[in-house]
Amino acid sequence: MKPTFLDFEQPIAELENKIEELRFVQDDSVLDISEEIARLQKKSLELTKTLYAKLTPSQIAMVARHPQRPYTLDYIQAIFTDFEELHGDRAFADDAAIVGGLARFNGQSVMVIGHQKGRDTKEKIRRNFGMPHPEGYRKALRLMKLAEKFGIPVLTFVDTTGAWPGIGAEERGQSEAIGRNLYEMTNLRVPIVVTVIGEGGSGGALAIAVGDHVNMLQYATYSVISPEGCASILWKTAERASDAAEALGITAPRLKTLGLIDRVVTEPVGGAHRDHAQMMTTLKRVLQDQLKEVQSKPMDALLKERFDRLMSYGRFKEDAA
């Protein structure tokens, strides 16, 4: 697949296009230009490292939304085996914006749940652009309760702009579905490991993100509202989205400092979309260590820590005047 470059990556795009041109010439020429290609590849790598070392929060938001970034089903296919998808909330419908089912992780039975976006237009519409309806969250809860019944851990993957705000979703109890998930996940008597792999948008993300260990990929985002939405409310224009992104503190390092996540998972140079295989290998190793850690703790201790984490969200302290 030909890489898609973001606006701030245009200098990289120009180098990569030059490399492709030279490769085409080399295939049809007796001249050996492999050294020149290698030199440009090295230059492209160094430029990518330089650009990504100083990304602004708004640029990180662009990376988190990259259309070639790995989605939940990509991680499931690469990290887990024997995945059996389970469908429906047993009340209204099967929401394709949430996927989940039984799988094996290093031979151990687990329940995997996550938001799922689409690649092409047809798939994006079917998945509702990764924005779940209430039935999606109720499906997720049904699978979590099933995991509790079987005594197997739950692993969730968060990647959504937010819960779907349509009239039908509100009529079917969107806020109740999200609130119910928060309540039930806090008391679920199995280990839960959460990973924010792309966008972590508001309650739509939090509804499957209450866990014992919360990871966040290096260029993922997690916030109460999108930068564009925040700017539209505060300044009546989405053009100040970069200011909003800075103020919201949407990046993984910032959230780690605030204690809202436990670990920042390093991405390949240029983001997870540049090297799916490397990203999968890194995350699998992280999940393996964390699952072993949380499973070694008494369940009552896990529940207390999980509850305390949820109650700490939104808490702040004012400095004395």
Curated annotation (Swiss-Prot):
Its main location: cytoplasm. GO terms for cellular component: acetyl-CoA carboxylase complex. Pathway: Lipid metabolism; malonyl-CoA biosynthesis; malonyl-CoA from acetyl-CoA: step 1/1. SUPFAM superfamilies: ClpP/crotonase (SSF52096). It catalyses: N(6)-carboxybiotinyl-L-lysyl-[protein] + acetyl-CoA = N(6)-biotinyl-L-lysyl-[protein] + malonyl-CoA. Its EC number is 2.1.3.15. The keyword Repeat does not apply. Residues 32-293 form the CoA carboxyltransferase C-terminal domain. The keyword Disulfide bond does not apply. Keywords: ATP-binding, Cytoplasm, Fatty acid biosynthesis, Fatty acid metabolism, Lipid biosynthesis, Lipid metabolism, Nucleotide-binding, Transferase. GO terms for biological process: fatty acid biosynthetic process; malonyl-CoA biosynthetic process. It comes from the Bacteria. It is found in: Cytoplasm. One of its GO terms (molecular function) is acetyl-CoA carboxylase activity. Signal peptide: none annotated. Gene3D superfamilies: 2-enoyl-CoA Hydratase, Chain A, domain 1. Belongs to the AccA family. Component of the acetyl coenzyme A carboxylase (ACC) complex. First, biotin carboxylase catalyzes the carboxylation of biotin on its carrier protein (BCCP) and then the CO(2) group is transferred by the carboxyltransferase to acetyl-CoA to form malonyl-CoA. NCBIfam families: accA, AccA_sub, PRK05724.1. Acetyl-CoA carboxylase is a heterohexamer composed of biotin carboxyl carrier protein (AccB), biotin carboxylase (AccC) and two subunits each of ACCase subunit alpha (AccA) and ACCase subunit beta (AccD). This is Acetyl-coenzyme A carboxylase carboxyl transferase subunit alpha. It comes from Chromobacterium violaceum (strain ATCC 12472 / DSM 30191 / JCM 1249 / CCUG 213 / NBRC 12614 / NCIMB 9131 / NCTC 9757 / MK).
